[in-house]
C-alpha cells in the first residue's frame, strides 16, 4: 500500500474508489494499491 498526495491509475485494471472519505486505488496487481493521505 502506497500512501501518496495524489493517486492515479498505473494500469488499465486499476480502479479508483472512495472509502471512509479516502480516495484509494485497487487493482489485481498488489503493487498498484494506493491511498491518498
Swiss-Prot record:
Record key words, sorted: Chloroplast, Plastid, Ribonucleoprotein, Ribosomal protein
An annotated GO BP: translation
Subcellular location per the Swiss-Prot or TrEMBL entry: Plastid, Chloroplast
Any Pfam family the entry gives: Ribosomal_L36
HAMAP family in the record: Ribosomal_bL36
Similarity section: Belongs to the bacterial ribosomal protein bL36 family.
Protein name: Large ribosomal subunit protein bL36c
